[in-house]
């Protein structure tokens, strides 16, 4: 396979994901802007609530849905179409069930935060935000499996279009709820949930009326929802752990900020910096998603060399981006914070930490791409082990020791993250170097076979016409659904 062709295939999948992710992450920036104009306490409380919502809700749902990636990607490559629909159905049900205890946790955050030593004023604002943010769980439970279901078929533009419409409405919703209706922090939370719901509506409309994809409800039967869970759960659980371990690190950083000399300024600055890392993360995330899809297709189609080529090219792209991101944030360290606040103390903390954040991206970008390879090869347990070691055995002790032991303060937390990212990168590269790609092809066959529900008396056969098997996109994929009886 030509290197140029594979790079074009990766960028065709990744570019719409970059645009979509920027749009989705920009909603947090818009929300932070409205919070900053409500006051310093509101900004700090809102940032704390967003972080808590991400690590206890969004990260869990997103992590579980990552378990779909290897099954759907490899099933698509192996042309086992029914497996895609059944996997979506099971994942949606799983996320709905998991959302219940998450919602209960959100509704009881005040005693949790106070026992952890957080400022009472900040905690009160965070409690209010989380109360009105609960509908986001239902919206996320639909969004994550549906976007994965579409992406593994090479369909990324529907999400981009839905995100564009949704983000255009987001400032309007914030203005109506926060300014006109004077709901304050409540309005910011409601507007955020509305944003995700709007994306869901767009994707569902596309799914219902488009003839260019496998339908997620194909083969839906009550008994199919009670069978064949193990392949999905065995991937979803470690995937969730891997994602959550990384997400939780940022929440720990927020909590540690609350123990510094000026908790309000430190928490607010950390919230803005975490949003900044979110913006920078969209390109590595897109590369990772593209790698996972292409590697899954290659392994499902019995092409180990193509999977290895995809891995190498993806890592090269990720390294180049990491270097560019480091230069970008370092150059803008004196002006970046002014986009969010005019508080001198907060601006000083942001400016001091941005160069360290830039160094973190040099490690974060390629290690995120490497995570995509592990996802595409159905090895989430390896990713979980790496994140546990890098972030909690190495990074957390470095952060605590540097911040409080050596009295470095706010920047010490970011030195901890830097050590974690570099450790993670080294361990990921070591894991990939030892990969036996021929063995991964055999594992892909075993996985898709196990995920197929062979107990049904009926199965659906889907005939796909693809102009170029190595270049699947929403423009060249035509799928007709035919029902055959065994």
Curated annotation (Swiss-Prot):
<dbReference type="InterPro" id="IPR002528">
    <property type="entry name" value="MATE_fam"/>
</dbReference>
<feature type="transmembrane region" description="Helical">
    <location>
        <begin position="187"/>
        <end position="207"/>
    </location>
</feature>
<dbReference type="GO" id="GO:0015297">
    <property type="term" value="F:antiporter activity"/>
</dbReference>
<feature type="region of interest" description="Disordered">
    <location>
        <begin position="448"/>
        <end position="474"/>
    </location>
</feature>
<feature type="transmembrane region" description="Helical">
    <location>
        <begin position="346"/>
        <end position="366"/>
    </location>
</feature>
<dbReference type="GO" id="GO:0042910">
    <property type="term" value="F:xenobiotic transmembrane transporter activity"/>
</dbReference>
<dbReference type="GO" id="GO:1990961">
    <property type="term" value="P:xenobiotic detoxification by transmembrane export across the plasma membrane"/>
</dbReference>
<feature type="transmembrane region" description="Helical">
    <location>
        <begin position="94"/>
        <end position="114"/>
    </location>
</feature>
<dbReference type="GO" id="GO:0016020">
    <property type="term" value="C:membrane"/>
</dbReference>
<keyword id="KW-0472">Membrane</keyword>
<feature type="transmembrane region" description="Helical">
    <location>
        <begin position="413"/>
        <end position="433"/>
    </location>
</feature>
<feature type="transmembrane region" description="Helical">
    <location>
        <begin position="386"/>
        <end position="406"/>
    </location>
</feature>
<protein>
    <recommendedName>
        <fullName>Protein DETOXIFICATION 53</fullName>
    </recommendedName>
</protein>
<feature type="transmembrane region" description="Helical">
    <location>
        <begin position="159"/>
        <end position="179"/>
    </location>
</feature>
<keyword id="KW-1133">Transmembrane helix</keyword>
<dbReference type="Pfam" id="PF01554">
    <property type="entry name" value="MatE"/>
</dbReference>
<keyword id="KW-0812">Transmembrane</keyword>
<feature type="transmembrane region" description="Helical">
    <location>
        <begin position="15"/>
        <end position="35"/>
    </location>
</feature>
<feature type="transmembrane region" description="Helical">
    <location>
        <begin position="45"/>
        <end position="65"/>
    </location>
</feature>
<feature type="transmembrane region" description="Helical">
    <location>
        <begin position="130"/>
        <end position="150"/>
    </location>
</feature>
<comment type="similarity">
    <text>Belongs to the multi antimicrobial extrusion (MATE) (TC 2.A.66.1) family.</text>
</comment>
<feature type="compositionally biased region" description="Basic and acidic residues">
    <location>
        <begin position="453"/>
        <end position="466"/>
    </location>
</feature>
<dbReference type="InterPro" id="IPR045069">
    <property type="entry name" value="MATE_euk"/>
</dbReference>
<feature type="transmembrane region" description="Helical">
    <location>
        <begin position="312"/>
        <end position="332"/>
    </location>
</feature>
<feature type="transmembrane region" description="Helical">
    <location>
        <begin position="240"/>
        <end position="260"/>
    </location>
</feature>
<keyword id="KW-0813">Transport</keyword>
<feature type="transmembrane region" description="Helical">
    <location>
        <begin position="267"/>
        <end position="287"/>
    </location>
</feature>
């Amino acid at each position: 396979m030509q290197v140029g062709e594979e790079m074009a295939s990766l960028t065709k999948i990744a570019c719409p994901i970059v645009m979509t992710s920027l749009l989705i992450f920009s909603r947090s920036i818009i929300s932070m802007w409205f919070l900053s104009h409500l006051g310093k306490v509101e900004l700090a409380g809102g940032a704390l609530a967003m972080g808590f919502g991400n690590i206890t809700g969004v990260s869990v749902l997103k992590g579980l849905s990552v378990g779909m990636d290897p099954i759907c990607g490899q099933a698509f490559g192996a042309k086992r179409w029914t497996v895609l629909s059944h996997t979506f159905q099971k994942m949606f049900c799983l996320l709905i069930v998991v959302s219940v205890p998450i919602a209960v946790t959100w509704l009881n955050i005040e005693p949790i935060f106070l026992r952890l030593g957080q400022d009472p004023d900040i905690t009160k604002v965070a409690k209010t935000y989380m109360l009105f943010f609960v509908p986001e769980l239902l919206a996320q439970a639909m969004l994550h499996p549906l976007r994965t279901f579409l992406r593994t078929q090479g369909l990324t533009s529907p999400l981009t279009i839905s995100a564009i419409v949704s983000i255009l409405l987001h400032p309007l919703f914030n203005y109506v709820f926060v300014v006109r209706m004077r709901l304050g922090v409540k309005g910011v939370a409601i507007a955020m949930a509305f944003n995700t719901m709007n994306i869901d509506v767009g994707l569902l409309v596309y799914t219902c009326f488009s003839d260019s994809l496998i339908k997620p409800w194909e083969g839906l039967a009550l008994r199919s929802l009670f069978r064949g869970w193990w392949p999905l759960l065995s991937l979803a659980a470690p995937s969730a752990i891997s994602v959550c371990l990384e997400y939780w690190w940022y929440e720990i950083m927020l909590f540690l900020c609350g123990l510094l000399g000026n908790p309000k300024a430190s928490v607010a600055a950390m919230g803005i910096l975490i949003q900044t890392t979110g913006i920078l993360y969209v390109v590595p995330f897109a590369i990772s998603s593209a790698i996972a899809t292409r590697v899954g297709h290659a392994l499902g189609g019995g092409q180990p060399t193509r999977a290895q080529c995809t891995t190498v090219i993806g890592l090269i792209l990720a390294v180049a981006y990491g270097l560019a991101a480091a230069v970008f944030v370092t150059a803008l360290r004196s002006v970046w914070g002014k986009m969010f606040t005019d508080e001198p103390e907060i601006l000083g903390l942001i400016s001091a930490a941005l160069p360290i954040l830039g160094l973190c991206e040099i490690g974060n970008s390629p290690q995120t791409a490497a995570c995509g390879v592990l996802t595409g090869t159905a090895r989430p347990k390896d990713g979980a082990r790496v994140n546990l070691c890098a972030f909690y055995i190495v990074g957390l002790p470095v952060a605590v020791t540097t911040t409080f032991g050596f009295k470095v303060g706010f920047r010490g937390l970011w030195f901890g993250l830097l050590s974690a990212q570099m450790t993670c990168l080294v361990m990921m590269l070591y894991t990939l170097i030892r990969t036996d790609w021929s063995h991964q092809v055999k594992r892909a066959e075993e996985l898709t076979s196990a995920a197929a529900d062979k107990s049904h008396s009926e199965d659906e056969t889907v005939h796909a016409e693809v102009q170029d098997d190595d270049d699947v996109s929403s423009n060249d994929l035509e799928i007709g659904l035919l029902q055959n009886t065994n």
